């Protein structure tokens, strides 16, 4: 089945990777040299993917979880017709389409941003979950409209990371059939021999999770690799194929050592390696025409045929199931139904509720009117109010179910919804306590880097949690999340702000959102609907102002906004001019015009106080050098929530005291 031309193609891919790294004088040649045979076999014999039709919905997804091996992926994208050779010559250079680690939406053919080890593996689980759910929802007899595989190339480092354990456990429990991991098992890590740090039995580990395990003893045996992938595709549940490889294969002096992991070979070793491959070291970035032809006649031909057949199936599906087809097409587009927001609840002045509870009510409506809405909680659904009532749970028997039981696997949960968002067809969300956002912070960061429409629900947002004490009371988390570029961090002050926050989350196509919600009840602010709508979308707005000459600004978010209003009303009775500003979303406020910012925070009013039950970090930008921040510079305490709030100075009396001191 395989011949000398296949070997030439593999060695060409190795050589392209080596040359890109040598020209950049930076990169990781070891993985591309060792893993090229498995990647080549997958792409030419199995992968249903045409880089020139990168948005085809039913394509297979290929994720290079070992993102440091990016030169391999770029070489594959070039020989398959997606990436210009000039881009390989600009590897790791400013403005190129070949950055050091693969970047989503930057290079056609890159499904997700990888590099932080383990996250690609976990995002792949999310992609397989998306495929399973959408298939369960839309497929009908004779119409497997969603039917594709998720393939992962993972390294030893990926499998050492804790997130791989969480994600593998989840995938095994849910028996995600179309998830296949190719494990580049080369017994070397960056620092040296793998047995110095990693000695577990991969077979026993993954079989304990409920995975299938296949061993390929020779990573250069194309038939053995091909047979393993074929076997994996026929099995129930996820499969890991451990492929024993030699890192830096072909390098006479560096193969099998950590010296080839993360540094260029050097000119002398490059020449020796090319001779081992039977290639001319005088030729750089050389691709024989036969190599291009192999990819045209295998991968691209297969992908084009599959896409044409699928398009015909979709046409027939649309005739047989017109309503379902329209829903499916809307899901593929990533758009929201028209007027979905009209179905969301509005709250009057008689309403008092925790923003987590208001969010829970909104979730019920979103699930009803936004069919692509899908997610779950890390074993805190009852507390986060994140489950869809009366809906089925997602599992292997009811993949169409809407409630995902992520279990106590916060990091894997965060990465999984990123994978779902990148997959497409869904508006995914995940929920946990705000203090546990630390467990999934790297996934938040990666969602922002990728510009995904992921929504993270974080409840129990402050010291008002009370009895659970400092381990469960967030302090530094708000500042940490606000520091992430391209992240909506929205802390709503009441039910109406929560409603608009959800609208912002779903409509922010290229920005993830963290919703920071209370456990305790909040009264409804006396502000008209349009003001709230515009104000939350702009990040900050005026919720109360006295008629007197403006003298003081009180800034707050979340539960402290009403406290600020109470203090302002007291100051009003004393004849003071006060404005209260709700600032639910700093990120959005920073994007507003200087004129809008000045209209909210007039520069000639310097007596300012910010009030927030969290670290004061960041607030001084808004209160200025003469202003004050009523925040928290220590950890919380265990006691009834109202008492903790009082002891930490979040009272009307303390606000008035601080105002008088200005």
Curated annotation (Swiss-Prot):
Homodimer. Belongs to the transketolase family. Catalyzes the transfer of a two-carbon ketol group from a ketose donor to an aldose acceptor, via a covalent intermediate with the cofactor thiamine pyrophosphate. It catalyses: D-sedoheptulose 7-phosphate + D-glyceraldehyde 3-phosphate = aldehydo-D-ribose 5-phosphate + D-xylulose 5-phosphate. GO terms for molecular function: metal ion binding; transketolase activity. The record marks 28, 261 as: Important for catalytic activity. GO terms for cellular component: cytosol. It comes from Staphylococcus epidermidis (strain ATCC 12228 / FDA PCI 1200). Substrate binds at residues 28, 261, 356, 383, 460, 468, 519. The active site is at residue 410. Disulfide bonds: none annotated. CDD domains: TPP_PYR_DXS_TK_like (cd07033), TPP_TK (cd02012). Mg(2+) binds at residues 156, 186, 188. Pathway: Carbohydrate biosynthesis; Calvin cycle; Carbohydrate degradation; pentose phosphate pathway. Keywords: Calcium, DNA recombination, Magnesium, Metal-binding, Thiamine pyrophosphate, Transferase. This is Transketolase. InterPro entries: THDP-binding (IPR029061), Transketo_C/PFOR_II (IPR009014), Transketolase-like_C_2 (IPR055152), Transketolase-like_Pyr-bd (IPR005475), Transketolase_bac-like (IPR005478), Transketolase_BS (IPR020826), Transketolase_CS (IPR049557), Transketolase_fam (IPR033247). Its cofactor is Mg(2+); Ca(2+); Mn(2+); Co(2+).
